[in-house]
Amino acid sequence: MSKTNSETGNNFEQQKQELIAALKACGAVRYGDFTLASGKKSKYYIDIKKASTDPKTLKIIARQAALRIKEMDVDTVAGVELGGVPLATAVSLETELPLLIVRKSVKDYGTKSRFVGDLKPEDRLVMLEDVTTSGGSVRDAIEVVREAGASLKYVITVVDREEGAGEKLKEADVELVPLVSASDLLK
């Protein structure tokens, strides 16, 4: 028996509330004066790297992302160093899909590759991101993956700060799938 859209919507709402409670309980939401990766100033900071070190919160994130992935035509889970790696690793374990780590730059030793893991031109990836603001950080990783010939149409973010990332990714033909929005988290 399949679930109705109403049941699925209620389930996603329950999951969102569970994740919000976990993020707050592990201390991932902080207030003060912060500078974001984009250079913008903010009165709050969402520390998903801290949440990633809490096994209960990381498990909730992985489980919820895995449920979204079931609706996508993908065969590889990717994450950008540093914040996306624990998320993508946990989701890879949950979904049993292969993991790809995207480095921010080429190392001048070892394989000298931007990728850790196998990437083939026919691969269809979903990228995991900790927090999205403007979408600039993840855009570089999307371009590198696409230059290698693989397809990337989805970015799952734990928290979307609702400051333009969705629109910027849409321009690149990528759908942003937030588990939680900042406005929901900060209520």
Curated annotation (Swiss-Prot):
Catalyzed chemical reaction(s)? orotidine 5'-phosphate + diphosphate = orotate + 5-phospho-alpha-D-ribose 1-diphosphate
Q: Extract the Gene3D superfamilies matched here.
A: 3.40.50.2020
In the record, biological process GO terms are: 'de novo' UMP biosynthetic process; pyrimidine nucleobase biosynthetic process
- Binding residues for 5-phospho-alpha-D-ribose 1-diphosphate: R103, K104, K107, E129, D130, V131, T132, T133, S134, G135, G136, S137
Give the required cofactors.
Mg(2+)
Subunit organization: Homodimer.
NCBIfam families xref list: pyrE (TIGR00336)
Question: What task does this protein carry out?
Answer: Catalyzes the transfer of a ribosyl phosphate group from 5-phosphoribose 1-diphosphate to orotate, leading to the formation of orotidine monophosphate (OMP).
Protein family: Belongs to the purine/pyrimidine phosphoribosyltransferase family. PyrE subfamily.
Could you identify this protein by its name?
Orotate phosphoribosyltransferase
Species this chain originates from:
Methanosarcina mazei (strain ATCC BAA-159 / DSM 3647 / Goe1 / Go1 / JCM 11833 / OCM 88) (Methanosarcina frisia)
Origin organism lineage: Archaea, Methanobacteriati, Methanobacteriota, Stenosarchaea group, Methanomicrobia
Q: Which gene encodes it?
A: pyrE
